[in-house]
């Protein structure tokens, strides 16, 4: 079944290796991201995407995935959370809170509702399909705590952090849509 999917979808050997967990790393300069200056300094993070559900055709295409229980996973672990020096900065990524979707991924997806395998348009990930952490430190001087100690002060640093994260997410979306378009042929 696996070989059939690869062959009919047109995946080459390198793409098949990627399917089997070969890591792919990308790095970008601030200029490539569209930023003239780095206002926030170094930071790190990890983002994960997960498909919440799948119809019978999706289950055949994504034969290596189990979709059961994923909605509950989104409620428990979903969202992109921020940590400063290993301490959680609330409310970012808090399920059920207005700041769960602090990058406004759902609104962005609604403006571009293309399906993953569609040849036209740009597929966008939803806030319930992505989880992860962003790690900052007290050295990130332009990412100051808000006056009420709940969140980060809106300003040049926080705006830049959001733009950088959206750039990274859009690169992921482009890669994911490439795979989705190939699988749509199957």
Model-found features: residue ranges?
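Charged regulatory segments coupled to nucleotide-binding catalytic modules in large multidomain enzymes
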Residues: 6-10, 15, 20-186
């Amino acid at each position: 079944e696996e070989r059939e999917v690869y062959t009919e979808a047109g995946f080459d050997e390198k793409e098949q290796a990627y399917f089997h967990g070969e890591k792919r790393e990308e790095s970008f300069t601030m200029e490539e991201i569209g930023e003239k200056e780095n206002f926030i300094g170094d930071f790190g993070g990890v983002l994960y995407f997960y498909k919440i559900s799948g119809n019978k055709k999706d289950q055949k295409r994504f034969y290596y995935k189990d979709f059961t229980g994923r909605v509950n996973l989104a409620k428990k672990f979903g969202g992109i959370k921020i940590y400063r020096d290993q301490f959680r900065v609330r409310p970012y990524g808090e399920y059920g809170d207005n700041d769960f979707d602090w990058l406004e991924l759902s609104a962005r997806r609604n403006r571009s509702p293309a399906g993953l395998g569609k040849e036209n348009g740009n597929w966008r990930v939803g806030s319930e399909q992505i989880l992860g952490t962003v790690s900052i430190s007290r050295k990130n001087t332009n990412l100051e705590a808000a006056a009420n100690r709940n969140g980060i002060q809106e300003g040049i640093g926080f705006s830049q952090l959001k733009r950088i994260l959206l750039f990274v997410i859009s690169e992921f979306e482009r890669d994911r849509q490439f795979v989705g378009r190939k699988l749509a042929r199957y």
